[in-house]
Amino acid sequence: MELNVMDHPLVSHKLTLLRSVDTPSPVFRQLVEELVTLMAYEGTREVRIEPTTVTTPLTATEGVALTRPKPLVVPILRAGLGMLEGMMRLIPSAEVGFVGMARDEETLQPMTYAERLPKDLSGRQCYVLDPMLATGGSLGGTVEFLVRRGADHITCLCILAAPEGIENFRKLVRDLDVPCHLIVAGLDDHLDEHGYIVPGLGDAGDRLYGLAE
């Protein structure tokens, strides 16, 4: 697994605003979108391209185009949805699939409750979106799911990660025979006894969309 912790002043600035308890949901959503677009620039560095010819107003010239099959963006529900627009802003021709993964608050293990993905992902580059890499279970379970369907290159984008989550995720994917890249905007200190990232930014889903009773 290849880890990239982003080092950019705008990333740090937006992450600081996201952490603030005083940032309301509408502003939080906008900041997430902006931050993910910055992350997507780095995350798509290895997106597959092929030569093509384009005609300018003056002449024909060589260029590149994204290869087929198209990249697949996979937000993990529900918080991952908040990252989708920022990703699609940079790569609008990508297709989108969904995985519903929730954490059992007693065992801290991931549970899949929904999925909407192509049955065959052979030859697909997949971009998995999950704001918080805490225990690593949800992200690792999603990556394993995609690999079983044939995905051969996976990049995961997370806004925050805990060291424990990165280590657990590394263990979960180390035996997978596909390249796996992890892009994080910030690396925090640790997990608390409830499995939450500290200092963190709170529950990303609740801060994006409010608390669903």
UniProtKB/Swiss-Prot annotation:
It holds the Pfam family UPRTase. InterPro entries: PRibTrfase_dom, PRTase-like, Upp_B, UPRTase/APRTase, Ura_phspho_trans. Its EC number is 2.4.2.9. Coiled coil: none annotated. Signal peptide: none annotated. It comes from the Bacteria. Binds 1 Mg(2+) ion per subunit. The magnesium is bound as Mg-PRPP. Its cofactor is Mg(2+). Allosterically activated by GTP. The keyword Coiled coil does not apply. 5-phospho-alpha-D-ribose 1-diphosphate binds at residues 78, 103, 130-138, 203. The keyword Transferase applies. Uracil binds at residues 197, 202-204. Keywords: Allosteric enzyme, Glycosyltransferase, GTP-binding, Magnesium, Nucleotide-binding, Transferase. It is an enzyme of class 2 (transferase). Pathway: Pyrimidine metabolism; UMP biosynthesis via salvage pathway; UMP from uracil: step 1/1. It catalyses: UMP + diphosphate = 5-phospho-alpha-D-ribose 1-diphosphate + uracil. Gene3D superfamilies: 3.40.50.2020. One of its GO terms (biological process) is uracil salvage. GO terms for molecular function: GTP binding; magnesium ion binding; uracil phosphoribosyltransferase activity. Belongs to the UPRTase family. Catalyzes the conversion of uracil and 5-phospho-alpha-D-ribose 1-diphosphate (PRPP) to UMP and diphosphate. This is Uracil phosphoribosyltransferase. It comes from Cutibacterium acnes (strain DSM 16379 / KPA171202) (Propionibacterium acnes).
